[in-house]
């Protein structure tokens, strides 16, 4: 079940024997926060709230306040929390703790800004990289040497696994799959360029196309699709597709085919062992598979793609939260634990029964 995840109440735990991490998953519109134990399980309810990042000078302050309030409402002392991992959209330099697209901290790293206010170590990374970390450590990319993790959401992100490690590129900006110029459609992307993959295949575009077709009188279960609540609209769209609605299936299939065209280019360059569709859009499940495969059939040299596995993530909406927790574990300060390796081995040994 893609919509369930193990949860344990803090009262069920022996607090003195365990440590925790706070995982924060952000996209351009919605943020989620949860407390997790080192066995990769939710210990608190997921707190979700709207936080628009574009042109929002208060976004960083708001995020910090929400994290601090979340911590204050826990029954667990902050000394039991190893740190806070945050996945977020944008051009993120994880090493410097800077997001060049959103939530500027006036020259200070976001890590330092948030950490100084909540008194815990903070680590940030791009949302698609964080999702790829989740797949690499605990998901479909585990023990794979090369993998491409597609983050189908309001944009179309990419996490690259090369030689068994997350590849971030020179400045940490690798994986801007959304902005591969694929179309001569005269559509302006939010990056300022024309014809990017995102302009035909993001979930925002799919919802926009749905509204257009409904306005033209197309019969569909999508009638009444929300206009100003895109997350709810996305859920309605995916649910309608799962129920066999022709319009919903058509729109998602078109997006999937276009993503497949982009994937064909990447396969020619990287020849990966596996391609994993993850992130928000993965909740549509097998609807994505046939159109992506059809695009590969048409645009990819058979010898290059015939041994590449395509898989839907088992994490569903949880991928970014799991990856944010991994982000803390991978940066674990030696002063907080005997050995980083011991921490990771604890998680690895339990993940098969936790997910």
Where is each model-derived feature located?
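Short, small-residue-biased leader/transition segments that mark boundaries at the very start
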Residues: 2-10
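Glycine-rich phosphate-binding/hydrolytic loop that grips phosphoryl groups
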Residues: 123-138, 282-355
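Glycine-rich phosphate-binding loop and adjoining helix at the ATP-binding site
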Residues: 45-146, 287-298
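Gly/Thr-rich phosphate-binding beta-strand-loop-beta motif of the actin/hexokinase/Hsp70
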Residues: 9-45, 149-162
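Hydrophobic "anchor" residues
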Residues: 42, 99, 166-167
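A mobile "lid/hinge" subdomain adjacent to the ATP/sugar-phosphate binding pocket shared
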Residues: 197-268, 273-275
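Glycine-rich phosphate-binding loop of actin/hexokinase-like ATP-binding domains
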Residues: 143-201
């Amino acid at each position: 079940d893609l919509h369930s995840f193990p949860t344990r109440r803090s009262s069920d735990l022996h607090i003195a024997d365990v440590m925790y991490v706070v995982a924060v998953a952000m996209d351009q519109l919605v943020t989620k926060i949860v407390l997790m134990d080192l066995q990769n399980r939710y210990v608190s309810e997921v707190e979700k709230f709207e936080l628009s990042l574009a042109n929002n000078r208060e976004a960083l302050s708001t995020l910090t306040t929400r994290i601090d309030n979340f911590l204050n409402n826990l029954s667990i002392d902050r000394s039991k929390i190893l740190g806070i991992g945050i996945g977020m959209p944008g051009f993120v330099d994880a090493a410097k703790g800077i997001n060049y697209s959103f939530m500027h901290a006036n020259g200070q790293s976001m890590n330092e800004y948030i950490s100084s206010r909540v008194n815990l170590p903070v680590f940030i990374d791009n949302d698609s990289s964080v999702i790829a970390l989740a797949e690499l450590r605990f998901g479909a990319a585990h023990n794979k040497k090369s993998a491409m993790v597609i983050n189908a959401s309001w944009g179309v992100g990419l996490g690259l696994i090369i030689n068994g490690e997350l590849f971030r590129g020179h400045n940490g900006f690798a994986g801007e799959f959304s902005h591969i110029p694929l179309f001569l459609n005269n559509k302006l992307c939010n990056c300022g360029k024309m014809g990017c993959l995102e302009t035909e295949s993001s979930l925002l575009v799919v919802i926009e196309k749905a509204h257009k077709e409904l306005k033209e009188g197309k019969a569909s279960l999508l009638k009444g699709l929300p206009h100003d609540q895109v997350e709810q609209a996305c859920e309605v769209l995916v649910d309608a597709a799962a129920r066999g609605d022709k319009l919903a299936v058509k729109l998602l299939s078109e997006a999937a085919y276009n993503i497949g065209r982009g994937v064909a280019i990447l396969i020619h360059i990287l020849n990966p062992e596996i391609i994993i569709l993850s992130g928000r859009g993965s909740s549509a499940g097998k609807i994505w598979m046939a159109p992506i495969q059809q695009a590969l059939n048409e645009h990819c040299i058979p010898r290059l793609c015939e041994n590449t596995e395509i898989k839907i993530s088992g994490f569903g909406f949880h991928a970014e939260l799991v990856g944010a927790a991994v982000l803390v574990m991978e940066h674990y300060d030696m002063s907080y634990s005997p050995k980083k390796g011991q921490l990771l081995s604890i998680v690895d040994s339990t993940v098969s029964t936790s997910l």
